[in-house]
């Protein structure tokens, strides 16, 4: 072999080695960025029932969780009785618990939503049946109970909103004017004439508050049957509320059949700008909404329909994602799931313009590749066109749910929910149901 041939072959071998290693590096990067590896699964609770309903990424790089607890032992140290209380847990950037506190009275008090406020504290919303201890007022069976906390969980102020029935606070926003916008269920049957008096169930009930929780306005939306809101977003000219409705009158003009996704756009004083129903002839329920970077909105829930707006039902119930315009026009829709029951409960934006979604699944086929028994928590990431980047199911042989998920400042994810399992992925159950935290990297 002459020197020239030797040099050429050496160059080819070197380039091949570099190319192969370059491809390997790219594959490794894609794996670490896209597969969503489980980092840790943790449960908190006592010998009774606990659940996490909401999680928020905090300004210090950590996160805070709101749920409820019934226990008085193990991880719960400040409860005087076994009635349900709100339960807030604050974690630092290393996933270490910084503090946890319970809030409520001697009645049934359960938290639904937590936000971090611009002053570094928190606001928490849910329902309360108490009129003692932390709760100073109650008008009936249950009221909305909104509590403002400082950065270490001390109560600054608290307010109740309700009538003589079961009124449930569900979603909470801090608005651009530093006030609050809260929505939930009005029990029309016990409202003393508020809302739609022909109603057989509940109305959407929206309340705009100032920075200290005083009511600016209060409005009701719905029809003659059951209308249940689950989430809301602020827009540049008002708010969009999403939930479900089986009404076909009063404020609802185009019900598709039984329960639909019902999306209501209102102005800054609560007047309806437009309302749209999405779904088919089966039961369709919207649970969460977020805005997109292209000026539209994505709504997540579940569907049992296979007609009209729903193009492809995969099983008994599927997670259903729709994208709508600022005017409520359907841009696209997609079902995800398998042959059993699958549902979506939350959606939030990620730093790469994608979305993290949480829910639950009973399927082991279709879009799912594992199930440990009954309902498993289901967490997955999509891009702006609903292409799946990764998905994970977490659970044991009993019932496990994920209710919320967010991305943290360090680009990892936290999903929260509840678990009654003590095997497979979950090995440390303390009672009936435990508060569940899933860390994903």
Show the residue positions of the predicted features.
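A sequence-level/structural motif corresponding to short, flexible coil/turn segments enriched
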Residues: 24-441
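Bacterial N-terminal signal peptides that target proteins for export
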Residues: 1-9
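C-terminal motif of bacterial Sec signal peptides marking the signal peptidase cleavage site
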Residues: 19-22
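Gram-negative bacterial Sec-dependent N-terminal signal peptides
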Residues: 8-16
């Amino acid at each position: 072999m002459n020197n020239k041939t030797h040099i050429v072959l050496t160059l080819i071998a070197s380039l091949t080695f570099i190319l192969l290693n370059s491809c390997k590096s790219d594959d490794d990067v894609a794996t670490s960025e896209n597969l969503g590896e489980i980092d840790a699964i943790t449960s908190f609770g006592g010998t009774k029932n606990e659940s996490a309903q909401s999680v928020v990424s905090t300004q210090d790089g950590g996160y805070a969780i709101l749920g409820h607890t019934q226990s008085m032992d193990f991880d719960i140290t400040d409860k005087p009785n076994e009635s349900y209380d709100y339960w807030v847990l604050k974690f630092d950037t290393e996933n270490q618990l910084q503090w946890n506190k319970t809030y409520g009275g001697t009645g049934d008090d359960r938290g639904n939503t937590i936000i971090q406020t611009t002053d570094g504290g928190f606001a928490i919303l849910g329902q309360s049946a108490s009129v003692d201890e932390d709760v100073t007022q109650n008008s009936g069976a249950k009221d909305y109970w909104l509590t403002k906390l400082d950065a270490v969980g001390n109560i600054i102020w608290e307010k109740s909103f309700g009538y003589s029935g079961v009124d449930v606070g569900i979603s909470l926003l801090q608005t651009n004017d530093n006030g609050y916008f809260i929505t939930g269920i009005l029990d029309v049957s016990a409202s003393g004439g508020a809302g739609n008096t022909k109603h057989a169930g509940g109305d959407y009930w929206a309340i705009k508050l100032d920075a200290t929780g005083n009511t600016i306005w209060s409005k009701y939306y719905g029809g003659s049957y059951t209308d249940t809101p689950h989430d809301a977003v602020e827009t540049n000219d008002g708010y969009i509320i999403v939930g479900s409705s089986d009404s076909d009158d009063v404020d609802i003009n185009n019900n598709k059949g039984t329960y639909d996704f019902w999306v209501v756009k209102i102005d800054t004083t609560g007047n309806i700008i437009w309302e749209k129903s999405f779904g088919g002839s089966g039961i369709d329920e919207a649970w969460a909404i977020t805005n997109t970077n292209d000026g539209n909105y994505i709504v997540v829930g579940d569907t049992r329909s296979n007609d009209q707006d729903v193009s492809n039902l995969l099983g008994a119930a599927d997670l259903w994602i729709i994208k709508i315009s600022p005017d409520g026009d359907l841009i696209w829709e997609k079902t995800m799931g398998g042959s059993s029951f699958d549902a979506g409960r939350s959606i939030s934006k990620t730093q790469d313009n994608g979305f993290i979604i949480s829910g639950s699944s009973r399927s082991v086929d279709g879009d799912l590749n594992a199930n440990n028994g009954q309902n498993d928590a289901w967490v997955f990431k999509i891009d702006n066109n609903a292409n799946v980047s990764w998905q994970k199911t977490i659970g044991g042989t009993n019932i496990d749910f994920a209710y919320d998920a967010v991305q943290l400042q360090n680009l990892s994810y936290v999903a929260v929910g509840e678990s009654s399992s003590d095997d497979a992925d979950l090995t440390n159950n303390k009672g009936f149901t435990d508060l569940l935290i899933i860390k994903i990297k």
